[in-house]
Curated annotation (Swiss-Prot):
Keywords assigned by UniProt, alphabetized: DNA damage, DNA recombination, DNA repair, Metal-binding, Zinc, Zinc-finger
InterPro entries: DNA_Rcmb_RecR, Rcmb_RecR, Rcmb_RecR_Znf, TOPRIM_dom, TOPRIM_RecR
GO MF term list: DNA binding; zinc ion binding
Chain's role: May play a role in DNA repair. It seems to be involved in an RecBC-independent recombinational process of DNA repair. It may act with RecF and RecO.
Designated gene of the protein: recR
Protein known as: Recombination protein RecR
């Protein structure tokens, strides 16, 4: 069945979201049009504002409406000598939810992937290099994902940080809290054994 051009455009636009296929997009569009037009207008307004007003922090590259994000503009955290390097702004939120890290962040917005045309320039590594060269960074914590690309990115950044005599650490990988060994994959178990600590 052919929909009106506007309805078809709405459905196609909703499909840009991750995990939203044609049927899900159609259900969402019908829900907004049939039952909740007020919420649809609010969604449209929020999307429009977010797309035009949210940019990147000039210091750490996470999302913000200001030139500096709340963490970088904080007197206490913005002057911290510890920087945690992550791949995405979602990683910042995950670490912040734990409430244990009190330093600054640097968001790569991806990972090195030469086949996809993602090199050091796309990850903002020149800005990270300026942070390291400033002498204000004592420790760099590498919290990239434990994927091939994440590990390659971590090694590249570690080499860069060594030139500036910065202490480099990597977040631990291993068995999750509450996990059962029989369900953990062999690579994760190997990392757990290699990264064991004395008690």
């Amino acid at each position: 069945m052919k929909f009106s051009p506007l309805l078809d455009e709405l459905i196609q636009s909703l499909r840009c979201l991750p995990g939203v296929g044609p049927k899900s997009a159609q259900r969402m569009a019908f829900q907004l049009l049939e039952r909740d037009r007020k919420a649809g207008l609010k969604l449209a307004s929020a999307l429009s504002s977010a797309m035009s007003d949210i940019g990147h922090c000039q210091s750490c590259r996470t999302y913000t409406e200001e030139s500096l994000c709340p963490i970088c503009s904080s007197h206490k955290r913005g002057s911290s000598s510890t920087i945690c390097v992550v791949e995405t702004p979602a990683d910042v939120l995950a670490i912040e939810a734990g409430g244990h890290f009190t330093g600054r962040y640097f968001v790569l917005l991806g990972h090195l992937s030469p086949l996809d045309g993602v090199g050091p320039e796309e990850l903002g590594l020149a800005l990270l290099e300026r942070h390291l060269a400033s002498g204000d960074v004592a420790e760099l914590i590498l919290a990239t994902n434990p994927t091939v690309e994440g590990e390659a990115t971590a090694h590249f950044i570690a080499d860069m940080a060594r030139r500036h005599k910065v202490v480099i650490s990597r977040i631990a990988h291993g068995v999750p809290v509450g996990g059962e060994l029989e369900y953990v994959d062999s690579t994760t178990l190997a990392l757990s054994f290699n990264g064991r600590i004395p008690l």
